[in-house]
Amino acid sequence: MKFTELTVKEFENFVQNPSLESHYFQVKENIATRESDGFQVVLLGVKDDDNRVIAASLFSKIPTMGSYVYYSNRGPVMDYSDLGLVDFYLKELDKYLHQHQCLYVKLDPYWLYQVYDKDINPLTEKNDALVNLFKSHGYDHHGFTTQYDSSSQVRWMGVLDLEGKTPASLRKEFDSQRKRNINKAINYGVKVRFLSKDEFGLFLDLYRETEARTGFASKTDDYFYNFIEHYGDKVLVPLAYIDLNEYIQHLQESLNDKENRRDDMMAKENKTDKQLKKIAELDKQIDHDKKELLQASELRQTDGEILNLASGVYFANAYEVNYFSGGSSEKYNQYMGPYAMHWHMINYCFDNGYDRYNFYGLSGDFTENSEDYGVYRFKRGFNVRIEELIGDFYKPINKVKYWLFNTLDRIRNKLKK
């Protein structure tokens, strides 16, 4: 085996292997996003004796104190069950970094520590051997965190395993609320379409509304546009919306049908108890449809023919479709836009051969008092599998300068207080 810099083509060919647990940050398109942020990029990997790539990682070189912080965001990509390969990679990476002006290195691999069912019952053993291997190479582990941290990627995820399933069989595994709300969205006639680059502002409108409502930390417009500009068809932006013209027409046709059926039944003499009950039920449905029709007509007058309900940013790579971020309109939540969007994207996975639908981030605190308990409950209702990643690892390379860097950082933080 040999540790080496890779060409873009070598890197891309390797990470396109769907059997590798790779992340959307470890794709060739991310080279351009990192460079547009002002960072140099280097592709490092391992080749076997037949010159085949067996490990790869995209590193950003972040200028710091006359040196570089080397950060492989969700890298490296490899068969991490092969501890011998991981050991070789870390050993050779250390040699490379000592020769290339590295201050310290950060790795947060897309590697599993433990897997749980939706109720946090363990399905696998803890992968302590992998964590201990990093530590044996001098890496500091950031810990098994159970909260969001703006300096780290999420460590917990909710994932749907689609392998061997169909949309119908998968839907049977959802809880009653998920099934009911998906059905509501379908009955309302909610549609989903993908936004073009020029329409991305529609996503941002819903995202900013949700940000203001929930108080969650958000990304800047430029952050999103950087991906939109460079990721091409690897970034997907669905929009769930309702066309009130179509909905009102459907409601009116349904109302007319029910009124006609009720009139026919009322015209009959000597009605049975069963017929009277049916008439009473139709009266309730007619009353409901009239209220819905009035509300929809008023909304069309005040808010327009098209109501944008929910939108999201998704990344698709060889391994999975990943829900990165989203927003929705609270005013129109009765139309179940987020459910329509997720159901559409789950079906997109089936249609395009993906075995994983990743709802992505969770804090790891699954108690009712946690900051994202509502998010967990939402994802839990889809019968997700909870995946815990191994976390962040740091290693100082230039130890003297690293000590000085941390000392100055602590002083700056004290001065800010």
Swiss-Prot record:
One of its GO terms (molecular function) is aminoacyltransferase activity. Keywords: Acyltransferase, Cell shape, Cell wall biogenesis/degradation, Cytoplasm, Peptidoglycan synthesis, Transferase. Its EC number is 2.3.2.18. It is found in: Cytoplasm. GO terms for cellular component: cytoplasm. One of its GO terms (biological process) is cell wall organization. It is an enzyme of class 2 (transferase). InterPro entries: Acyl_CoA_acyltransferase, FEMABX, PG_Glycine_Bridge_Synth. Pfam families: FemAB (PF02388). It catalyses: MurNAc-L-Ala-D-isoglutaminyl-L-Lys-(N(6)-tri-Gly)-D-Ala-D-Ala-diphospho-di-trans,octa-cis-undecaprenyl-GlcNAc + 2 glycyl-tRNA(Gly) = MurNAc-L-Ala-D-isoglutaminyl-L-Lys-(N(6)-penta-Gly)-D-Ala-D-Ala-diphospho-di-trans,octa-cis-undecaprenyl-GlcNAc + 2 tRNA(Gly) + 2 H(+). Belongs to the FemABX family. Catalyzes the incorporation of amino acid(s) into the interchain peptide bridge of peptidoglycan, using aminoacyl-tRNA as amino acid donor. This is Aminoacyltransferase FemB. It comes from Staphylococcus epidermidis. The gene is femB.
